[in-house]
Curated annotation (Swiss-Prot):
ANK repeats lie at residues 1-28, 31-61, 65-94, 96-116, 120-149, 153-182, 186-213, 217-248, 250-277, 281-312, 358-385, 431-460. Transmembrane segments: none annotated. Keywords: ANK repeat, Repeat. InterPro entries: Ankyrin_rpt (IPR002110), Ankyrin_rpt-contain_sf (IPR036770), PRANC_domain (IPR018272). Gene3D superfamilies: Ankyrin repeat-containing domain. This is Putative ankyrin repeat protein FPV218. It comes from the Viruses.
Length: 461
């Protein structure tokens, strides 16, 4: 029988045929050697495989090998051998579901169900999405693969594509009906798994993914994004529902970020992160920072800056955020003590500077006390940012917000003008501009934004 092994190993087809005619069994085995059919498949020799099958080799023999001949043919990526085995009734329940595009074409041709699942309830599409095999993903979808099938862990093909940061595959799945709001067994949306990549986050949000859904641990995509995401990604995930959302341990995004980059910490503070929230152990973000043996001074400064500024709105904020209870620690670090003094001086200066004569002060602007700030955007050039090194970001942020609001309001006025004129309602059109402006100021900005987007979409159609 060894002669058959040597003939196969040296790809001597004539010798193989002669030995089989002389009565050597095509499935003969010798301990420590592959079966003849398996060895031929590993050599990717189509002729040898064909000869053995024609002479009675069993295409489903797995007595010694841990996988079937069909599985091995798929693994070595030989469509021709796969087709041969299927022609000889290879068992289609004995092969892996991660297959290449050429193999998929063969399997589909032989009538294999593209929605078949393995013991982990994963389908062909799960594996193709996980491995960013775009051609296979497209082929499977064209042949009826279920884009929303979930495996034993509740993961959909979109979850797999997103977790591997394969944006193109994710986009193809979304274009073909993949649901962005599908949850796995841990309550995670695809957005939770893709929260560290700007392109993926933007793609999922563009396709309607909610950003405020919590997983079983109470974490939003923003909680996931904090550690490894860029500032631009964080901005996509922040809104009034997520900025102070608490996980099951009462950690806000600010608790997560305190040991990370100061730039992202400041961004959360600008957008309304609450520095008074306590975690399950009763610690505010400042408490945690002050308890660390190695102090992250820039982050402590950022929270102190916010505390002294917002104290103008909430008088007992220093106590609530943990500043008073940590005063001794802060006072013993000269850099922090000096920062406290600088904050107080700068806030006093902000009280003295107005946007225009007898108008709101810069402090009013920074503490959101001015509802009609967008009316003052033309006076923004009066601000000398160099005079406010600590709070210049707060001032710029509020002014940019006001400019955005003014733009939205003006677009909405034009939109409403257009709607009313089309319907021959001249009453709105005849209203003074200031009165129209005043009315729209009280409309929810997010509602206006969605209204404008909807109108733009209809116009494109």
């Amino acid at each position: 029988m060894l002669s058959l092994y040597y003939a196969i190993n040296y790809k001597n087809r004539k010798m193989v045929e002669r030995l089989l005619r002389e009565g050597v069994h095509p499935d003969s085995t010798i301990k420590g050697f592959y079966r003849p059919l398996v060895k031929s498949i590993l050599l990717r020799d189509v002729d040898l495989v064909s000869i053995l099958l024609q002479n009675g080799a069993n295409p489903n023999n797995i007595n010694d090998e841990t996988v079937s001949p069909l599985a091995i043919a798929i693994k070595v990526n030989s469509p021709t051998i796969v087709s041969l085995l299927l022609d000889y009734n290879a068992d289609t329940s004995l092969f892996p579901l991660y297959v290449s595009f050429p193999i998929i074409k063969v399997l589909v041709y032989h009538g294999i169900d593209v929605n078949v699942i393995d013991r982990e309830s994963r389908s062909f599409l799960h594996y193709a999405a996980k491995n960013d095999d775009v051609d296979t993903v497209i082929s499977l979808i064209l042949h009826g693969a279920n884009v929303n099938v979930q495996d034993s862990k509740g993961l959909s093909p979109l979850h797999h594509a997103v977790s591997k940061k394969t944006t193109l595959t994710a986009k193809i799945l979304l274009e073909n009906g993949a649901r962005v709001n599908i949850r796995d067994s841990l309550g995670r949306l695809p957005l939770h798994l893709g929260a560290n990549t700007y392109e993926m986050v933007k793609l999922l949000i563009d396709y309607g993914s909610p950003i405020d859904i919590k997983d079983v641990n109470g974490s939003t995509p923003l909680h996931y994004a904090i550690w490894k995401s860029s500032l631009d990604t964080i901005r996509l995930l922040v809104n009034v529902s997520t900025i102070n959302a608490l996980d099951n341990n009462c950690n806000s995004p600010l608790h997560y970020i305190i040991l990370s980059e100061t730039e992202i910490l400041v961004e959360l503070l600008l957008r309304g992160a609450d520095i008074t929230i306590k975690d399950i152990c009763g610690n505010t973000p400042l408490d945690i920072l002050c308890k660390l043996r190695i102090k992250k001074l820039d982050n402590i400064k950022a929270i102190i800056s916010n505390a002294f500024l917002m104290r103008e709105v909430v008088p007992d904020l220093l106590k609530l955020c943990g500043f008073e209870s940590n005063r001794k620690i802060i006072s013993n670090i000269s850099d922090l003590k000096q920062h406290e003094v600088s904050c107080i001086k700068e806030i006093h200066l902000m009280k003295e500077h107005s946007f225009r004569k007898n108008g709101p002060t810069i402090l009013d602007v920074c503490t959101d006390k001015v509802h009609f700030l967008h009316r003052l955007v033309n006076a923004r050039d009066n601000v000398q940012y160099k005079d406010f090194p600590i709070y210049c970001k707060y001032i710029k942020f509020r002014i940019e917000k006001a400019i955005y609001k003014k733009t939205i309001i003006e677009k909405t006025i034009l939109l409403l003008d257009d709607i009313l004129i089309k319907h021959e309602y001249t009453s709105w059109h005849d209203l003074p501009y200031e009165l129209k402006h005043y009315i729209i100021e009280y409309i929810n900005i997010e509602f206006i934004k969605s209204l404008l987007e909807h109108t733009n979409l209809k116009n494109k159609e």
